[in-house]
A protein has these predicted regions:
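Glycine-rich, proline-tolerant flexible connector loops at the mouths of alpha/beta enzymes
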Residues: 40-64, 73-77, 104-116
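Non-cysteine beta-strand/loop elements that form the S-adenosyl-L-methionine
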Residues: 8, 97-106
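Conserved, mostly hydrophobic/aromatic
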Residues: 14, 34, 100
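Aromatic/hydrophobic pocket-lining residues that form the small-molecule binding cavity
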Residues: 27, 53, 85, 122-126
Length: 141
């Protein structure tokens, strides 16, 4: 029989819906329920952009989980910064999760207008961020 792994992003992506807000207590309760359901990975928030998520990860470490692994979410390092000196990546490490999810921009418009950097610098940010987190065993490529 094939094994199905579930990666749930309700606590991170679902919280971006209009009118949706989760308190730290809400998130802790939902984590327990998802674990009871056998969900393997729970992407629970972005500790680098939200103090409430940072508090959640600190408190969630105390919850004994049977099945689930918590996953922190965040972006690559900022332009001109080394990954080990970037506050956002530092918050992913400090979240204390077994894994993390990172995103990088790939649309030229975002690279130019949101990141305000070159394609080469953007690729460096992605490459070095992934290399740094992989060395800490927080991502698997």
């Amino acid at each position: 029989m094939r094994r199905v792994s579930i990666f749930d992003s309700t606590l991170r992506d679902g919280a971006q819906g209009s009118g949706v807000t989760f308190s730290v207590e809400d998130k802790l309760k939902i984590v327990k329920i998802l674990d009871q359901l056998g969900v393997e990975c729970i992407e629970a928030g972005n500790p680098g952009s939200n103090p409430k998520d940072l508090e959640f990860f600190q408190r969630a470490r105390q919850i004994p989980l049977r099945y689930a692994k918590l996953v922190a979410f965040g972006s690559t390092c900022r332009k001109g910064r080394r990954p080990e000196d970037d506050e956002n990546l530092r918050s992913l490490v400090q979240a204390g999760t077994d894994f993390c999810t990172v995103f990088g921009k790939c649309w030229r418009f975002h690279v130019d207008c949101v990141l305000e950097t070159t394609e080469e610098e953007n690729l460096r940010m992605i490459r070095e961020s992934c290399r740094y987190l992989k060395a800490l065993s927080l991502i698997h490529i």
